[in-house]
Amino acid sequence: CKEVTLTYYERIRILNPHLHAYIFIDEEKGLNWADGIDKLFKCGVDLGPLMGVPIAIKDICSVDGMPTTNGSNIISDDITGPEGSLVKRLKALGCVILGKTHTVEFALGATGLNKYKGTPKNPWDEKIHRIPGGSSSGSGVAVAAGLAAFAIGTDTGGSVRIPASFNGIVGLKTTKNKWPTDGIFPLSPT
């Protein structure tokens, strides 16, 4: 797990300065977590199919020890609240959180453009800055560019499906109330 996680961080160090998929990365924390997962593997512990998988989390989801900007310059951690059930479940399943991905301000926008925190670059065109789609723009770019095995996004009006389409990957909008939304910025109850 630690070797795989380190490989992702090496790729992030090379590509993220150009692609801007991530707004926050905590390599030390991620590698420590991966090391702990490796120790569980060695002890015969199996947390299931997500154990040791390096993932990215959209920057409207609270993750303990990581800032949450909601894509805005307005201080909004108190709106999002503490780490929620979804992130806690992913950690309990052994996922390694690489960092937080860019989003449009307060997750409201389909293009992926963010004049405050920066806009991720669609990885499929090196010459022309094509929009990544939004609002889960960084999550779409991170997966398309191989900067995470998968990424968590949110979707009210296409915010997972649009970046998935624009970046040539699969995005899934689950049924309402399928996943808990505590610890996630409340754009809409969907």
Tell where the protein language model's regions lie, with residue ranges:
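Short loop segments at secondary-structure junctions
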Residues: 146, 175-176
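Structural signature of FAD isoalloxazine-binding scaffolds in flavoprotein oxidoreductases
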Residues: 161-166
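A short core secondary-structure module
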Residues: 176-190
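Gly/Ser-rich catalytic/binding loops embedded in alpha/beta enzyme cores
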Residues: 1-156
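Structural motif
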Residues: 52, 167-169
